[in-house]
Every structure is written in structure tokens, then in C-alpha cells.
């Protein structure tokens, strides 16, 4: 039995790769998991639903605002300190053999608490440009797993710890009830901009079938009016739909790009320009460089440009699916270090 403490939440981009790692580890060895979730965020809801066997602890913490000298960060820093004390109490009680972290502010809290208690730390960075938590925790980690080779350039001091693995993807046996459609995603919370844009595109492409994850019941009702659109408020499991998609339109969050690359689906990427450290833009440009997508800046996105790009990616056809899920390599590395 291996006891694992884990954190990586606030958004689906941090959460789903972490669940992929934990689920893969659980297939190989007996595990007991203590999961630290951000109170009121997606990880709290999804983990309790998908993994009731995990012990899930909700922590009331928020990340630091940018720029870092923002006046509200004084209060947030105090809350981070209080949260770290709370996390330490749980870690002392649970006595984990290791900690697995995938970024986000909750990872910073759990990672620093684990460091103080001498618990081995393993970190995964999904984005091309590492976030603040991963930059800080890399110095204490036994291994730093990264999705892209280029990420090494941002963690030069810790080259001996870095393992390029790709970004883990959750597996599923389920399959969507449709096939040969363009998958439209706005991220785990939906995207108003993508929803509004596609509402103008759908009447022009009535021969093309779309599945659109809207992020809200109102948008689901609104977009369901188009006969060529299957509108869903939330898609779960995502893999069931990626398997059957012929192309995609999405933001450029790390887990979305990971699924796109894993299932070999060419995509149109509209990065969210306000993402921290320009994560999404850098992710999108790297995916485009590797031949997986077309990048359209949000301020340049128009119905006509989307229609032209859909034609290009559909004609490109599906790319060969990855032979191995990065979660497998990460699991092997972790088990090799602790067993």
C-alpha cells in the first residue's frame, strides 16, 4: 500500500492530468489517496464524484494576483499561511509516502508543507511556461515532469530533475453516441467568446456536425436551436468525444491540447490572452509548431476566419494517436523512485 497526498486544482487544466496520474498508479499498485481540493472549485466537485474512495480535504485558499505587488495579496498571503498550517496537520495525520502536485496555488501550499515535513515531492507542469508554484517547488522536488521539451528553458537550474513526458490524459472505455463531428470546447468553465463566435458560424456550415461544450445551461439551450449542433453544458468523460471527433475548436489550456495531441485530432486554437504568464498563447504556438493546430488570436477571430480554418483542419485529417499515455511514464518514474 502506497499512501499518496495530491493537489492540483482550481481549474480542469491542473486537475485532469493529476487524476490521470493517480488513476494510472492505482492500476499498478494499491494506493490510498489524500486529495487537497480548492474550496468551491472544480476539483472539489469532480474528485468527490469520480473518486469517493479518496479522502478529499477542501482548503480555503486563493492564488496571488498579478502583478505580485497587488495590494490584495497581503490578505491572500495571510490566508496561504493559515492554509499551510492546516495542510501540515493533515499530512502529519495521514503520513503519505509521497506527494504528487500538478500546479496551481493549492500545489504551492501543499508542496511547501510537504517540504517542511520531509515528504518526497513529484511535480508535473502541463504548460510550456511553468507557473509560479512549479518554479518554486522544482527546487524541492525529486522529479519534475514536463509536457514539452521547451519547458527546460524556464527551469535551467533543475535540469537533472526534469523528465519530458508529455501531458497525462484520462482514459475512458466510453464512446460518444455520435461520430465525425467537430468538437467545440471553451475550457472547464466554458467560453463566452467562443460561444458567441460559433453562434454565427453554425448557420453557415449546416452540412457539418458539431458537438459544443457550452459551460452554461443558457448557452446549451440557445445553441441547441441549430440542427447541426449537439450542445452540452459539460462533457464527461472528455475522451469519449475526442475519440470520435475529426477536428476541434478550443482554448489552449494544457489539458485540452494534451487530449488533442493524444487522440490525434487537429485543432483550431483560440488562446485566452489573459491567462497567467501567457500560458495559453505559448501552449497554442507550440502545438502549432508541432503540427497539431492553427492558432487564431482572439482579437483576430471572426466567423469567416473560423469557417476557412475548419475547412483546413478537416482536410488535414486525423493525426496518428499517441502510442502511450504520458501518465504511464510518469507512474513508472514515481514507482522507480519510491519502491
Swiss-Prot record:
GO BP annotations listed: carbohydrate metabolic process; cell division; cell wall organization; lipid glycosylation; peptidoglycan biosynthetic process; regulation of cell shape
Catalysis: reaction(s): di-trans,octa-cis-undecaprenyl diphospho-N-acetyl-alpha-D-muramoyl-L-alanyl-D-glutamyl-meso-2,6-diaminopimeloyl-D-alanyl-D-alanine + UDP-N-acetyl-alpha-D-glucosamine = di-trans,octa-cis-undecaprenyl diphospho-[N-acetyl-alpha-D-glucosaminyl-(1->4)]-N-acetyl-alpha-D-muramoyl-L-alanyl-D-glutamyl-meso-2,6-diaminopimeloyl-D-alanyl-D-alanine + UDP + H(+)
Compartment(s) of residence: Cell inner membrane
Keyword Isomerase among record annotations: no
One Gene Ontology molecular-function label: undecaprenyldiphospho-muramoylpentapeptide beta-N-acetylglucosaminyltransferase activity
EC number(s) stated in the UniProt entry for this protein: 2.4.1.227
Pathway: Cell wall biogenesis; peptidoglycan biosynthesis
Chief site of localization: membrane
InterPro entries named in the record: GlcNAc_MurG, Glyco_trans_28_C, GlycoTrans_28_N
Pfam families per UniProt: Glyco_tran_28_C, Glyco_transf_28
Function: Cell wall formation. Catalyzes the transfer of a GlcNAc subunit on undecaprenyl-pyrophosphoryl-MurNAc-pentapeptide (lipid intermediate I) to form undecaprenyl-pyrophosphoryl-MurNAc-(pentapeptide)GlcNAc (lipid intermediate II).
Record protein name field: UDP-N-acetylglucosamine--N-acetylmuramyl-(pentapeptide) pyrophosphoryl-undecaprenol N-acetylglucosamine transferase
The organism's taxonomic lineage, starting at the top: Bacteria, Thermotogati, Thermotogota, Thermotogae, Thermotogales
